[in-house]
């Protein structure tokens, strides 16, 4: 039977259509996915993301361990609260998961990992951590609410204490701070400003209702997907998995190659892939009628006249732009145009960088 987050009852009270999402009953939408999408782009929306897994690490060798476990380098994290995005790789450089790691103190780091990969992530982390003598705690006692949009911070702040408002004042993106019972982070999955707020499970329902009273719109998985796709953000299982290199998933920027003597899991395989070349993740825009969908073939002719084919990993109609967009994994050599096979027709598409909307504005 699917699990329920501490906010399940609040979702039903808000009229949510609930679906099974990787073993969790989660809201798909609360009536209109499009309205929820526009609320985040134009005002403020909130998402229950309590199905995500929060893992706390304590011990004297955490930094050393995470420098080995992760492709990005936590040596960059020198200011308490600073976070970074990274892949966790297999020895053959496939992506086990993408995650966020927070540096809270020299003997305390926090990871937030995906729900779909929870069991394999925890098993992999435990296995790799064994020699390091760490205390690893899965925080199932905590809930997580993302508040996103141009008015999100202001509306969320109406629920904060004076001390909490002071703690987050001027906080830059990709930081987190423990302020009273709340862990407040300037992270998100929408391409908008906002907070991801962690709280004890027993406080989640009251906090949700407080956000409702502040005029924040509840949003489901449907809007979360169209928002992240407009922002060009990966979804595990679509843009990457254990069979896909981070270099083929627009995650090259998350790999810390320097210092050259840092040994991290997957490094040797990654270096070989970098030398040989990999596929790449691109954006696609189709202004003609129709919708780009995951699994559709993408065809193009490279500069040497060779016919090549890739595949759409995620596609949708963009509510912000008013036409269809997609992410696609394609062989090297693609130019600025291609065609996508939709049923019996080859539809022309424009090839872009992955990412279509930021802070409510088109960037394609």
Curated annotation (Swiss-Prot):
EC number(s) given by UniProt: 2.1.2.10
Any one annotated GO CC term: cytosol
Gene3D superfamilies tied to this protein: Aminomethyltransferase beta-barrel domains, Aminomethyltransferase fragment, Probable tRNA modification gtpase trme, domain 1
Keyword tags: Aminotransferase, Transferase
Biological processes annotated in GO: glycine decarboxylation via glycine cleavage system
One MF annotation (Gene Ontology) recorded for this entry: aminomethyltransferase activity
InterPro entries: GCS_T, GCS_T_bac, GCST_C, GCV_T_N, GcvT/YgfZ/DmdA, GcvT/YgfZ_C, TrmE/GcvT_dom1
Pfam families according to UniProt: GCV_T, GCV_T_C
Catalysed reaction, written as an equation: N(6)-[(R)-S(8)-aminomethyldihydrolipoyl]-L-lysyl-[protein] + (6S)-5,6,7,8-tetrahydrofolate = N(6)-[(R)-dihydrolipoyl]-L-lysyl-[protein] + (6R)-5,10-methylene-5,6,7,8-tetrahydrofolate + NH4(+)
Family: Belongs to the GcvT family.
Subunit organization: The glycine cleavage system is composed of four proteins: P, T, L and H.
Primary role: The glycine cleavage system catalyzes the degradation of glycine.
Protein name: Aminomethyltransferase
Organism lineage: Bacteria, Pseudomonadati, Pseudomonadota, Gammaproteobacteria, Enterobacterales
This protein's encoding gene: gcvT
């Amino acid at each position: 039977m699917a699990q329920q987050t501490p906010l399940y009852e609040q979702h039903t009270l808000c009229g949510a259509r609930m679906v099974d999402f990787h073993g969790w009953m989660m809201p798909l939408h609360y009536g209109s996915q499009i309205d929820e999408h526009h609320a985040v782009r134009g005002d403020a929306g909130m998402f229950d993301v309590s199905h995500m897994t929060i893992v706390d690490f304590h011990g004297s060798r955490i930094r050393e361990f995470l420098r080995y476990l992760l492709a990005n380098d936590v040596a960059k994290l020198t200011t308490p609260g600073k976070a970074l995005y990274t892949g966790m790789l297999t020895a053959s450089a496939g992506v086990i998961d993408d995650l966020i790691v927070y540096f809270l103190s020299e003997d305390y780091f926090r990871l937030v990992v995906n729900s779909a990969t929870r069991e394999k992530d925890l098993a992999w982390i435990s296995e790799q951590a064994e020699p390091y003598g760490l205390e690893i705690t899965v925080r199932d006692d905590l809930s997580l609410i993302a508040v996103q949009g141009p008015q999100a911070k202001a509306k969320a702040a109406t629920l904060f204490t004076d001390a909490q408002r002071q703690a987050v004042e001027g906080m830059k993106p990709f930081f987190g701070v423990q302020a009273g019972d709340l862990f407040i982070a300037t992270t998100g999955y929408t391409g908008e400003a906002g907070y991801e707020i962690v709280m004890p499970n027993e406080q989640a329902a009251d906090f949700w209702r407080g956000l409702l009273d502040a005029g924040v719109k509840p949003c489901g998985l449907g809007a979360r997907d169209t928002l992240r796709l407009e922002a060009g953000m990966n979804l595990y299982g679509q843009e990457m998995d254990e069979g896909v290199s981070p270099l083929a998933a627009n995650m090259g920027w998350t790999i810390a190659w320097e210092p050259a003597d840092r040994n991290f899991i997957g490094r040797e395989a990654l270096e070989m892939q970098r030398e040989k070349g990999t596929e790449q993740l691109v954006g696609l825009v189709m202004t003609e009628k129709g919708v780009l969908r995951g699994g559709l073939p993408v065809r193009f002719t490279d500069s040497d006249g060779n016919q090549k084919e890739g595949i759409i990993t995620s596609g949708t109609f963009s509510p912000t732009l008013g036409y269809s967009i997609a992410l696609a994994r394609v062989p090297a050599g693609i130019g600025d145009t291609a065609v996508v096979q939709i049923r019996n027709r080859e539809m022309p598409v424009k090839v872009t960088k992955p990412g279509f909307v930021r802070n409510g504005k088109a960037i394609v």
